[in-house]
């Protein structure tokens, strides 16, 4: 890969209301998705809005996983930005789809930091 990272933008539709409105559960699911991807968690912050909705981010040594939920519409927006090519984004997305009960997922992936170095960039940053 001749890019510093991958940015996956995923939209989860027809999700379970109770699941995506529970900030503790959403955080647990996001943290597990990080583990399944092979990324390294540094810190997470999640917030529940009133009357509904959750936003949160998991900072990983490889970049971040972020989520915003709209339970009233059964919808979640997820960003997974990871550096290097050793992280399994698909494993994370498959787990999120299952746990959110999503019946329809749309995914766009783009390379970030495309550099003309003439070599593949194989790395997995190590957090402090």
Swiss-Prot record:
Its EC number is 4.1.1.50. Transmembrane segments: none annotated. The active site is at 63 (schiff-base intermediate with substrate), 68 (proton acceptor), 83 (proton donor). The record marks 62-63 as: Cleavage (non-hydrolytic). Binds 1 pyruvoyl group covalently per subunit. Pathway: Amine and polyamine biosynthesis; S-adenosylmethioninamine biosynthesis; S-adenosylmethioninamine from S-adenosyl-L-methionine: step 1/1. The modification Pyruvic acid (Ser) is found at residue 63. Its cofactor is pyruvate. Heterotetramer of two alpha and two beta chains arranged as a dimer of alpha/beta heterodimers. Catalyzes the decarboxylation of S-adenosylmethionine to S-adenosylmethioninamine (dcAdoMet), the propylamine donor required for the synthesis of the polyamines spermine and spermidine from the diamine putrescine. This is S-adenosylmethionine decarboxylase proenzyme. It comes from Leptospira interrogans serogroup Icterohaemorrhagiae serovar Lai (strain 56601). The gene is speH.
């Amino acid at each position: 890969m001749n890019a510093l990272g991958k940015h996956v933008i995923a939209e989860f539709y027809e999700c379970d209301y109770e699941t995506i409105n529970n900030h503790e559960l959403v955080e647990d699911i996001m943290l597990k998705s990080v583990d399944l991807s092979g990324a390294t968690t540094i810190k997470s912050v999640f917030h529940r809005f009133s009357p509904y909705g959750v936003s949160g981010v998991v900072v990983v040594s490889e970049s971040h996983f972020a989520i915003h939920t709209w339970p009233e519409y059964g919808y979640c927006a997820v960003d997974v930005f990871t550096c290097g090519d050793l992280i399994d984004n698909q494993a994370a997305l498959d787990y999120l789809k299952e746990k959110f009960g999503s019946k329809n997922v749309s995914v766009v992936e783009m390379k970030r930091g495309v550099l003309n170095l003439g070599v593949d960039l194989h790395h997995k940053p190590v957090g402090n």
